């Protein structure tokens, strides 16, 4: 979350995705004055990994500057499903608490073609 660009909301989010080969890619949220042009930390991490040729992920960890747990938005859940439908979503908070969910718990009826 340290590198997040969040001048409008002040809500900074960071994510790290673990690839099947053991490599890790990080991402942060990047806001834009036109909110629709903003990008979440989870998708930033996924897109960085995919752009480097990685397409199999085991888990993603997410943390924010907020007081509680930050769950991935619906768009991020669907993007994650594309690459890790059996994967884990690890949530951390500023107090050191951790929660772990299977992605299928957070997106029980994912869209697919």
Regions found by a protein language model. Name each.
Residues 1-3, 52-113:
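C-terminal binding/interaction regions
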Residues 12-19:
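Short beta-strand scaffold segments in enzyme catalytic cores
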Residues 45-49:
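Short, charged beta->alpha transition segments
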Residues 6-9:
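Short loop/turn motifs at secondary-structure junctions and domain boundaries
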Residues 26-30, 104-107:
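Short beta->alpha transition motifs characteristic of CBS
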Residues 28-44:
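Compact, glycine-rich, soluble single-domain proteins
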Residues 18, 31, 40, 57, ...:
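Short, electropositive, low-hydrophobicity segments enriched in small/polar residues
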